[in-house]
């Protein structure tokens, strides 16, 4: 089960009071963030929702939003991105007093408040506040997808045949963001018609694996000059 499968299950059941999206793959965390914002119909002008990309200058305001009761609705959603104090990165956006306020929120979160944390990196499990967070929150860790998982994921959201997706995955070195870009590339090239394997070969740049295979083949055939040109 991929992190996207886990997220679909969470959406089916309804978002928990506290959700943490984290991982070392910025691309996958970013994709989950976009899906979350779509799921909750996020609107910056909606007073029942708040989003903060945390910095030392806005952290007090973010904590006040988190601690406040909703005024214009029955519930409030607060999304905090880049609360780096919770990760293994040696950085911080909250000072000690602010971090204690956040910890106090975790001790007794108001029923009317939903919190989503979006973090790039690993959680620092040694920290007391992270231990509390893990006990209270649903965790979604964005881990790199394997080749077949990539193909399966994009086959759900793309009309491209699996054979085409398999070739794109190979040419993308099984990288999520590169594969996403290459899918857009071949669809733009095809101008609405069905994408073929030939389209992929023509449009998608050769992967490192492709180049190594071609280089090895040229060397075995004694075509040294062509091999040098390839490099």
What is each model feature region?
Residues 2-4, 30-217:
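Non-catalytic interfacial helical region
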Residues 179, 226-228:
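Solenoid-repeat scaffolds in large eukaryotic assemblies
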Residues 1-37:
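Glycine-rich P-loop/Walker A and Walker A-like loops and their local beta1-loop-alpha1 context
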């Amino acid at each position: 089960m991929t992190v996207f499968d886990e997220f679909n299950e969470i959406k089916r059941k309804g978002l928990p009071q506290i959700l943490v999206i984290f991982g070392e793959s910025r691309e996958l965390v970013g994709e989950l963030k976009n899906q979350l914002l779509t799921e909750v119909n996020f609107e910056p002008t909606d007073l029942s929702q708040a989003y903060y990309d945390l910095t030392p200058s806005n952290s007090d305001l973010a904590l006040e939003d988190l601690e406040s009761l909703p005024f214009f609705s029955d519930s409030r959603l607060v999304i905090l991105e880049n609360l780096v104090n919770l990760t293994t990165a040696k950085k911080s956006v909250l000072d000690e007093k602010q971090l204690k306020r956040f910890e106090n929120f975790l001790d007794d979160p108001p029923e009317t408040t939903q919190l989503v944390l979006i973090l790039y990196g690993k959680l620092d499990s040694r920290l007391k506040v992270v231990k509390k967070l893990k006990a209270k929150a649903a965790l979604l860790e964005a881990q790199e997808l394997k080749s077949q998982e990539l193909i399966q994921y994009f086959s759900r959201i793309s009309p491209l045949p699996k054979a085409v997706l398999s070739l794109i995955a190979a040419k993308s070195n099984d990288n999520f963001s590169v594969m996403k870009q290459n899918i857009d590339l071949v669809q733009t090239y095809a101008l609405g018609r069905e994408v073929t394997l030939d389209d992929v070969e023509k449009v998608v740049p050769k992967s490192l694996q492709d180049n190594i295979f071609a280089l090895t083949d040229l060397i075995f055939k004694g075509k040294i000059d062509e091999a040098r040109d390839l490099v």
